[in-house]
Amino acid sequence: AVTLNVLHISAYNLIYEEGTALWRMREKGLVKECEEEESLQMFETLIDVLGFSGYEHYEISNFARSGRYAFHNTSYWKGVPYLGLGAAAHSYDGKSRRINPSSLSEYMEALQTGHVAYMEEKETVDSLYNEYILTSLRTCWGLNLKKLEDDFGVERMRYCLEQALPHIC
């Protein structure tokens, strides 16, 4: 990827999903899962190589050159509303999350008949608070205490600080 001079790299740890070809290959012994220590060493090497090659490590699994961050993912991590179109697409309006059917035929049928085909999950203040903290801590921008206070109140901001202080060097 470095020699191809790509502007953005997403590098996720490989997982084995039950029911997939890769899962079956592992079960048959055709591929071997890495030990956790080896996986950690490979990730640290990736961070070093990409950093040396001019990539900014801006989120746990994402690297970019020249500030070319993934727009959709950055919006997600910062809690910005977004619209997902198509089968299996996700949307967020600031208050709820919607997931379109994963089956293309089911999605198309719903569109043609004018029916609402998505599943909706209403967010609670607690879920929004927890998600903001967890997604913020994944990024190089970290947690914005002013935003935390503005969006969730001074008590929740103080609680977050109280919980974090023992872990700050």
Where are these regions (language model features)?
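Short amphipathic alpha-helical interaction segments
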Residues: 153-168
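C-terminal scaffold of the Radical SAM
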Residues: 1-154
